[in-house]
Amino acid sequence: MAVCIIDHDNIRGVIYFEPVHGKDKVLGSVIGLKSGTYSLIIHRYGDISRGCDSIGSPEIFIGNIFVNRYGVAYVYLDTDVNISTIIGKALSISKNDQRLACGVIGISYINEKNNTFSYN
């Protein structure tokens, strides 16, 4: 399982990439955005030393998230991405090609704690 922590200005969230019943899912929540539709995109680099300006070009479109009128998005998406290939890359939340927030995708503590992850 992989995890990405988003913490940029007032935009915060946790996004997990995990196998659920044999399929890879993207799960989590994000707060602090205005209501509307936003894109989750994986970028080439996990370098956030200059915020979202240093994460490189977009590589994989994960899907769209929908933020409700309270500024909350609940994420539950299917993905074909191989989780092991995205470790160390960045995930951005974007709208109209503008990167609003981003974070680095890392190995989740649950992997180390349990050696495997199972969804019950």
Curated annotation (Swiss-Prot):
InterPro entries: SOD-like_Cu/Zn_dom_sf, SOD_Cu/Zn_/chaperone. Keywords: Disulfide bond, Host cytoplasm, Virion. It is found in: Virion; Host cytoplasm. The keyword Transmembrane helix does not apply. One of its GO terms (cellular component) is host cell cytoplasm. GO terms for molecular function: copper ion binding. Disulfide bonds join C52-C102. GO terms for biological process: superoxide metabolic process. Its main location: virion. Belongs to the Cu-Zn superoxide dismutase family. PANTHER family: SUPEROXIDE DISMUTASE CU-ZN -RELATED. Superoxide dismutase-like protein with no enzymatic activity. This is Cu-Zn superoxide dismutase-like protein OPG175. The lineage of its organism: Viruses, Varidnaviria, Bamfordvirae, Nucleocytoviricota, Pokkesviricetes. The gene is OPG175.
